[in-house]
Amino acid sequence: ALVVYIVFWIIIYKKEKIKWVWVSIHNIKKRFIENFQFFISSVAGHVSIHGGLIILANFVNNTILGEFALAQKIALLMRMVPIFFTQAILQKASILFENNKIEFNSYVNRIFIIGLSITFGMGLIAIILSKWIIFLLAGSYVIYSETILKILAFIPFLSMLNFNNMIKILVDEKKHLLARATWITAIIMLILATIGSYYYGGYGLSIALVLTEIVSFIVYSVLLIKNKHERA
């Protein structure tokens, strides 16, 4: 396998005529810092998404934990929709940001409205069909999972509220703001999740996750406004 891998890369290097170039220590250090900021942002994102379930495991039995996890998996899948929107327009948004700020704002706001409409509709459908969605996945009616899903159904919509902020951070390469915002959000989520899980179990954690999306929107907005004033 190693030999095949090496041969494969040799062929690519020769075919594409790739040349080795010495990179300065300064550039290596700069890229390392940038990538490290993305890395810690990703870690914070995983903490925000999966940390709650780990906390809940300390306060409920395995049956309740499994029923909660079933509903959360559906909500997490739905939460990918705002991420798909961000990835889909990022390249075009970056070009518009460099060349035409007015068109950039118009384009991003237009996609933002579309995203809000779609995620809101998804939330309504998930609430209305929650009983049958759980039955389809579990093979039986699980009232607890159904109720949890109804609470978590609007997480994609609330996550979409942060769409504009995320696009602005990414196109302007404000990696330090992204790292700070994700970790502030993660820490607040851990606090809310611990309190909610301790007093109300899965229901408390569900509400904590919903509140975390609202907190995330506020944190990103405040940091962007503060950064704008500092640069003015």
Where are these regions (language model features)?
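Hydrophobic alpha-helical transmembrane segments
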Residues: 1-15, 72, 184-188, 202-226
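Interhelical loop/hinge segments that connect adjacent transmembrane helices in multipass membrane
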Residues: 6-49, 92-106, 227-232
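Interfacial/gating helices of multi-pass transporter permease domains
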Residues: 27-34, 38, 55-75, 143-146, ...
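Interfacial transmembrane-helix starts/ends
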Residues: 32, 101-117, 125-129, 146-149
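Helix-terminus/linker motif at the lipid-water interface of multi-pass membrane proteins
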Residues: 46-77, 95, 132-138
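Helix-loop junctions and terminal segments of transmembrane helices
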Residues: 75-99, 166-171
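Interfacial segments at transmembrane-helix termini and the short loops linking adjacent helices
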Residues: 128-160, 203
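Membrane-interface junctions at transmembrane-helix termini in multi-pass inner-membrane proteins
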Residues: 154-181
